[in-house]
Amino acid sequence: MVPLSRDLIVLVVDDNVGMRSIMTAVLRALGFGSIRLADDAIEAQKVILHVKPDLIITDLKMPVMDGVTFVRNLRADESHPFSEVPIIVATGHTEEKHVRACLEAGVDQFLAKPITGRALAERITHALAPDREFIRTATYNGPRRPLGRTYPHSELD
């Protein structure tokens, strides 16, 4: 596993304040000390101009610009310094069409809500792996026994 580091900067993009709070708490519990927040993709694009995140965790369905468009914009220009930043989508929209759209846009990992700390840690580890291009995965952590604390969809969407 890739060690999780306090030195890494994580940008969380979600229009739900409750979800941003939960993600912040989980990331801090995992050892991340530098967490930036954006309440939509437009704000995230502004944050990225000032802070180069090592990892982006974004929601899929947001007002103004959805997560897929946000990722496509980041990945569009390969010469852009942020085109290779690892990206995880965390969403309650787990239908195959959403997973496929995310992966085609360039998302590194897909995390279905409700999230667990363990599932998030696994996705982060894979997203930050040096050979992440070869291990891009889309997994569904839906109807099975949770491996840690879970958060109900009502708190997240």
How should each PLM-predicted stretch be described?
Residues 21-25, 69, 83, 94-109, ...:
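Alpha4 helix (beta4-alpha4-beta5 surface) of REC/receiver domains from two-component response regulators
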Residues 37-46, 67:
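Helix N-cap/capping motif at the beta->alpha junctions
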